[in-house]
Amino acid sequence: MQEIIPGLFLGPYSSAQKHCLKTLRDHGISHIICVRQDIEAQYIKPQINDLSITYLTLNIADTATENIIRFFPTVKQFIDEAFQRNGKVLVHGNNGISRSATLVLAYIMEKYGLSSK
């Protein structure tokens, strides 16, 4: 798990499991975005039943044809609301390298007014 910008972390699924609760608390994580495919729902799912952590679970196919852009407004709103409450957000997928990283990058581009050029 790495802090990409202040308060926004990116990591693999393993960083959001029950045995990581102390680490999540030490980093001040209050919100988690769980990114998975429908077929991963059996094993990529919220693991922490702690009322201090708010989850957003997104079913996003890990394919070249998935329209991930349609999820950006929901992700942005969730992260913005967490920040307004002085929270910190972990975004994770299975490995934390494609779908979840894309969502984090899109948030940063929107927040700082960056283009793809």
Over which residues does each language-model region extend?
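Cysteine-based protein phosphatase catalytic domain of the PTP/DSP
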Residues: 1-91, 103, 109-117
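P-loop (Walker A) phosphate-binding loop of NTP-binding proteins
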Residues: 94
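Glycine-rich nucleophile elbow surrounding the catalytic serine of serine-hydrolase chemistry
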Residues: 97-103
